[in-house]
């Protein structure tokens, strides 16, 4: 039995050290490994398969709203990056530069894209001439480079995978509608696919994207009580259009500037899944995103007929549309159970000679470890139902955790005490002054996460300065 436990013994307890627990899970579940390039990581098959499932489902949802995929170069000339001053100032500290082409110095250095607003603007300048060319609703799946000082697998790395949508519209109203539409798409995706509840809201001016008129965000609460920004949608107004000269002729033959949006999510969604649902045995994956949904584990598989029945069950489950693995390795059952739990496979099916003789199998849920004995003939019908239940239960548990770790502060002493002694979101009123936002961060390390669309009037005054309040804000320590 000691050998069976090696997989889980290697994981640090969440309560002992959450950061180390997270790293242990990433490595032991074989999601990633570290690269020889500092600050970069290697996606192993198990980790990349999760990203593929995220990408495929999100891309399907994008296309239902009229999004088309494109791909633009990864290099941006310095002169192009500097066209929009607020934008370049926001990214300058993180930019990686290419100064040589082979052995020859470049006449103009190129940055490796930290984001692609400037490239899309340069592209749209030539693509858009008339109102008939609008709207443009493009997205690209790619990697970007930001020279981060502190990195952590999936959450923050110097190169990461993401999608970035860039759109151009004839009117401000159309741009705002698209901005909100994509934020809602992200929120629905997180809740329906990743089983992660999110708060939708608007960023403060201090926290909004460089060059945007407004930034909207979805904020999730991790198991350790820290917030994770899980997707953003930006309304650029006509600021970038004026900087780059993106104009169109309207129906009255008048020249007008387009209105633009940008929206994106990244592989930090994988980190969000790990930190929302995982436990001390490893990953707990929502069925809709799990690369393998069912692990069929034959017990005493060398006995006549056991392995054949396991293969037969595996084929029946695949025919029912499930992602299935039959673990026919020569490891003992205890080791296989530990590995299945470590990898977060939502359901395992245990079957040995006595089970087969009785025409039954045991289904074990990864999230609750509940055991359900089912007729082998009913597995293909029952398991999809159980997976649906797991998906719903995981969302409800995550929502209950968030509600239990969301606090209200009506004065500054209460705010500071909550920030010092409790982990989670703090709801508090704010006057709209950046000085108060800065003071709260300096005193408590809490940042404004968002001004939620669902506003509550907790009091009439700012929690920090006592002046009249303008909005209720979610505050928290964040990744």
UniProtKB/Swiss-Prot annotation:
GO molecular function annotations of the record = ATP binding; catalytic activity, acting on a protein; proline-tRNA ligase activity; transferase activity
Q: Name one GO biological process term.
A: prolyl-tRNA aminoacylation
The similarity comment for this entry is: Belongs to the class-II aminoacyl-tRNA synthetase family. ProS type 3 subfamily.
Top-level EC class, please? ligase
Q: Can you say what this protein is called?
A: Proline--tRNA ligase
- The gene for this chain is proS
| Domain of life where this protein originates | Bacteria
Major subcellular site: cytoplasm
Q: Print the keywords alphabetically.
A: Aminoacyl-tRNA synthetase, ATP-binding, Cytoplasm, Ligase, Nucleotide-binding, Protein biosynthesis
- Record's Gene Ontology CC terms? aminoacyl-tRNA synthetase multienzyme complex; cytoplasm
């Amino acid at each position: 039995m000691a050998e069976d436990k090696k997989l889980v013994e290697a994981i640090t307890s969440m309560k002992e050290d959450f950061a180390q627990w997270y790293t242990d899970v990433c490595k032991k579940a074989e999601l990633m490994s570290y690269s020889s390039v500092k600050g970069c990581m290697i996606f192993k098959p198990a980790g990349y398969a999760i990203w593929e499932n995220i990408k495929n489902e999100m891309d399907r949802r994008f296309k239902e709203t009229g999004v088309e995929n494109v791909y633009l170069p990864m290099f941006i000339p310095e002169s192009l990056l500097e066209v929009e001053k607020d934008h370049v100032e926001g990214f300058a500290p993180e930019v990686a530069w290419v100064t040589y082409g082979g052995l020859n110095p470049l006449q103009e250095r190129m940055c490796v894209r930290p984001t692609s607003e400037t490239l899309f603007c340069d592209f749209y300048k030539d693509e858009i001439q008339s109102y008939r060319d609008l709207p443009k609703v493009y997205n690209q799946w790619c990697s970007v480079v930001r020279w981060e000082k502190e990195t952590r697998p999936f959450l923050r790395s110097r190169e990461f995978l993401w999608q970035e949508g860039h759109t151009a519209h004839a009117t401000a109203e159309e741009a705002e509608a698209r901005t909100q539409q994509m934020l809602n798409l992200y929120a629905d995706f997180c809740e329906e696919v990743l089983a992660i509840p999110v708060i939708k809201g608007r960023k403060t001016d201090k926290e909004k994207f460089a060059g945007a008129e407004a930034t909207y965000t979805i904020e999730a609460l991790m198991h350790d009580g820290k917030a994770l920004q899980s997707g953003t949608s930006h309304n650029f107004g006509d600021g970038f259009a004026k900087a780059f000269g993106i104009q169109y002729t309207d129906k009255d033959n008048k020249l007008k500037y387009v209105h633009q949006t940008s929206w994106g999510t990244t592989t930090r969604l994988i980190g969000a899944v790990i930190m929302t649902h995982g436990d001390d045995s490893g990953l707990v994956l929502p069925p809709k995103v799990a690369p393998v949904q069912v692990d069929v584990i034959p017990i005493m598989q060398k006995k006549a007929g056991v392995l054949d029945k396991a293969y037969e069950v595996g084929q029946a489950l695949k025919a029912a549309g499930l992602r299935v693995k039959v673990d026919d390795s020569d490891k003992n059952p205890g080791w296989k159970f530990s590995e299945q739990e470590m990898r977060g496979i939502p359901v395992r099916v245990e079957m040995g000679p006595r089970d087969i003789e009785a025409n039954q199998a045991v289904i074990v849920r990864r999230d609750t470890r509940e055991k359900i004995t089912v007729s082998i003939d009913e597995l293909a019908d029952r398991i999809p139902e159980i997976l649906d239940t797991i998906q719903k239960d995981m969302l409800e548990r995550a929502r209950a955790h968030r509600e239990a770790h969301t606090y209200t502060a009506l004065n500054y002493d209460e705010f500071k005490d909550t920030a010092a002694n409790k982990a989670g979101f703090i709801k508090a009123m704010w006057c709209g002054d950046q000085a108060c936002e800065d003071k709260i961060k300096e005193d408590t390390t809490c940042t404004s996460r968002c001004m939620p669309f669902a506003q509550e009037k907790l009091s009439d005054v700012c929690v920090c300065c006592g002046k009249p309040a303008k909005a209720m804000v979610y505050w928290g320590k964040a990744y």
